[in-house]
Amino acid sequence: MTKTLKIIEVKSEIGAGTRGASLGVDAIKIAALDFGSRFFKKHKSIEVPNENHLLLEGTGSPYAKRISGILTMVERVSDQVRTTLEEKEFPVVLAGDHSTAAGTIAGIKAAFPKSKLGVIWIDAHADIHSPYTTPSGNMHGMPLAMSLDEDNLESKVNKLDQETINYWFQLKNVGNIAPKINYRDLVLISARDMEKPEEYLLKKNKVKIFTTADVRKRGVERTVIDTLVYLDHCDLIYVSFDVDSMDPTASRGTGTPVAQGLTEREAGKLMSGLITNQKVCCFEIVEVNPTLDRENQMAEHAFEILIKATNAFRNE
């Protein structure tokens, strides 16, 4: 079945610790032009207004930097994803930093509140910190905690002020559904850089993780099958792809590169394999940062993965 794509552009980077991720969406568009592709002409797109002006101001809470702006962005992305799904279109989210993924998840739940949502998180990081456990305060490390309604107080290291506590509560409750996903409905792929509080949660909740080594040992096709079988009880599936899941040898054009990642070919096969599943209702590519790159390599890789994925479900 051919799906009508709608590209949702989220040029936000207030959740990241390094600057430049907000330029990633346009870098992917430039890569498309360089490849002579009409992809961005063929599919309609909408840009979500951003709060990047906050980068010129103070960070606010040291344990939840620019949290007021993050809340605004999560709400805006949620509204746009919900509207897109309600209009029977397939949202393809191209975003800067990964914090706004909490908005993508919130939007899917707003459109389908009674559906069980599975999440496939392809990322070097678990992104499951809360303001109570974060070592950096950068909120692109927290979207899954927002969606899981997770404070992880057992691993608490930071004392929060009341304003931060209030904003964090609001973030977890965007759309008045909390939690939006469950640990049993989550699969991490290529996760390899976690702190102790995150490892504690993943172990405690028996989260399904396929490391890069697992992917290579099983093969991409088997990994796709095993992931989808594991999430077979879910009604809908959302796939979020952070380009830092790929190895830095492919490109360093992302804010938090980590060795021992996927190759561009493995990532492309993985995404195109997952996307063909009928339950997949949305996918996302995040964290391309052309300011850290050479010759726009990462954006080119991201665009190639985008094309492989969309071609897979459009049967082109």
PLM features per residue range, with description:
Residues 2-316:
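Conserved alpha-helical scaffold segments that buttress catalytic/binding sites
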